[in-house]
Amino acid sequence: MDAESILHMLDVESAAEHRTDGWWVDVPDLDVRGLATLMRTREVRFVTLTGTPDTAGGYRLIYHWDADGALLNIATTVSAGCIASIADIWPAADWVERELRDYYALVFEGRAETPTLMLLEGDEPGLFSRTSAAGREIDPAVTARDAAEAERKES
């Protein structure tokens, strides 16, 4: 199914912007499970999910889909640190949900478990949240364990 038809079904085509790299739309309060189910039934392929902190203290999540060769990017905002999981509908979302949990301590509701992906077992989720508070000069890949230990000692 083509991207424009999907946007029409979501009733967001008027807010969507077509760019050289695909269709982009922001959907506040997105029902991600409803979206994932619609995409599954319409045979639109899940590509990935990206997440970044937003300026209001929440997170911006972008669900990327391949609709007959056109990239469809549907963004939403998470303010409370949790959002519904789509991994049971789209197993390919499993790793990226685990990655976002490790990096930002996001909770994906509905998962039976969320094992670590980038962190070691027993490490606290939220690697980027912790290290960004310590300053930009810290390399999270190298010093995450040291930053977490220093934070524990200060508490």
Q: Where in this protein do the model-derived segments appear?
A:
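Terminal low-complexity/charged segments
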Residues: M1-S155
